[in-house]
Amino acid sequence: MTTRVAARRSAATLRGGIICESLKPGTELEGYELRIIRWSRYEIRDPAPWQPSVWTLIEFEAPADDSDSLAHRLSKDLAAPGWYANWNTAREAVVVFPHKIFRYKRGDSSGRETAKEYGRHCGVPEAQLDWDD
């Protein structure tokens, strides 16, 4: 694969994570071209009172064209309080909370802080506001 093709492919792909326990019962993510990169379970040291102490994280890739529809879907399917999902494209970071979506240029500290502030307002523990962008 040439560098140009690889760059085009990475620019056209989003990569992120969804914690299974953050989804409302009955959630189905059908119709998206999600490709699971890793499926892992791990213990959380200091979960919030409403969070379980063991989480299942699905790390995934999908076509960047699915970013908007996936964000809108997850904004309806994430449980409240205190959960979010996030992903990045080559240029953009996307953070999805219940009923609220944040998009900002990767590396934009102001955009990141706006999303983190909203997360704090929604009850996400500070230590969990640690997504990569």
Label for each model-derived stretch:
Residues 26-28, 68-70, 129:
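Short acidic, gly/pro-rich beta-turn/loop elements at beta-sheet edges
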Residues 35-106:
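Short, intrinsically disordered low-complexity segments
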Residues 102-133:
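Acidic, proline/glycine-rich low-complexity IDRs
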Residues 3, 43-45, 87, 109, ...:
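Sparse, context-dependent recognition of short Cys/His-centered cofactor- or disulfide-binding micro-motifs
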Residues 3, 7-53:
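N-terminal, charge-rich interaction modules
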